[in-house]
């Protein structure tokens, strides 16, 4: 039940979104212990983002999850997400922010967990 939304200045094809989704699901399983059946991803490409006054290759990733993941898990996930986006989208790791938003209120299938 994490929702992982990636905003980036880079243009993404459908096939790139599909491959990123597969990798994000793998990373989420490894770092947070959440399987692919519970992961939702979103992509907002061609976003108007600026970092250090520059709008070149930039990304902002939001990880919203039910419950609070461990600090070790989120630290590991940040490293892997930055590595993924750097490799796949040529975004420098120092131009990527990853923010975590845990919540105890998460709804699915008509009710809350």
Language model regions located:
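Interaction-mediating elements
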Residues: 1-113
């Amino acid at each position: 039940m994490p929702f992982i939304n990636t905003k980036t200045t880079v243009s993404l094809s459908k096939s790139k979104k599909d491959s990123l989704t597969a990798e994000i699901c793998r990373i989420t399983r490894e770092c947070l212990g959440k399987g692919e059946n519970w992961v939702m991803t979103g992509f907002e490409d061609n976003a108007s983002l600026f970092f250090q006054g520059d709008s070149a290759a930039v990304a902002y990733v939001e990880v919203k999850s039910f419950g609070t993941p461990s600090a070790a898990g989120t630290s590991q996930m940040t490293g892997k997400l930055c590595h993924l986006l750097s490799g796949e989208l040529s975004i420098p790791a120092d131009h990527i922010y990853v923010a975590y938003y845990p919540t105890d209120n998460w709804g699915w299938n008509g009710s809350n967990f």
